[in-house]
Amino acid sequence: YCWFCRAPLPDKAKKCIESWLKHCPNYTILEWNEDNFDIHQNGYTEMCCKEKKYAFLADYARLQIIENEGGFYFDVDVELVRSLDPLCSEHAFFAFETDRMIATGLGFGAEKHHPLVHFMLEQYAPLLDGKHGVIGCPQLNTQALLKCGLKPNGKRQTVQGAAVFPKAYFNPYEDATGRLYITDCTYAVHWYAKSWMNRRTVLRSKLTRPLHRLLADHPRIKGKVKGGV
């Protein structure tokens, strides 16, 4: 996992890491931070640090780390619910965040120097001078896999030898409604800590969950609301 900013890990992050230790007791867990990751390697990483956009720095860092080292990666707001051992036979795996978007923060893994991870990293090339702002990982991750044959349908599939899993595997928590849909195939739950958002935005998303649940349960209301905007 990545943890930049020199701040102590939040209690929720510690609980998630405890779940990793529980379900994968024989795995080595490594923290990547300013001491073992070169934050000055390009303009993009320097800009992310200077502007305290640590979540976007982690988006980039995780790809470079897994390309060079191999292994599994999870954000610190991801809780494991079972062992990752069945995934060790995969050359690489990724997961849908929505039916159309891939997000490596949910959890992903790959052998060292896997070409798809390298290609994902290459999507950052236009941003490396640090003069063009930041782009969230779902957009860039999905962009790379679409170029390699991904079908944006939310279904399990194989892309150039890598497994791509549906939402139920790594994203069973519906952040908009606050509902959790764990199944027998679920490996992990992404709790959406939203460390890259300001507190007001995070609070607003929590306050609107009852409305999103209502709209999800009553499609006719959703249609009326949409039509009235």
Predicted regions and their residues:
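Glycosyltransferase-associated regions of secretory-pathway enzymes
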Residues: 1-58, 74-229
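Small-residue hinge/turn detector
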Residues: 60-71
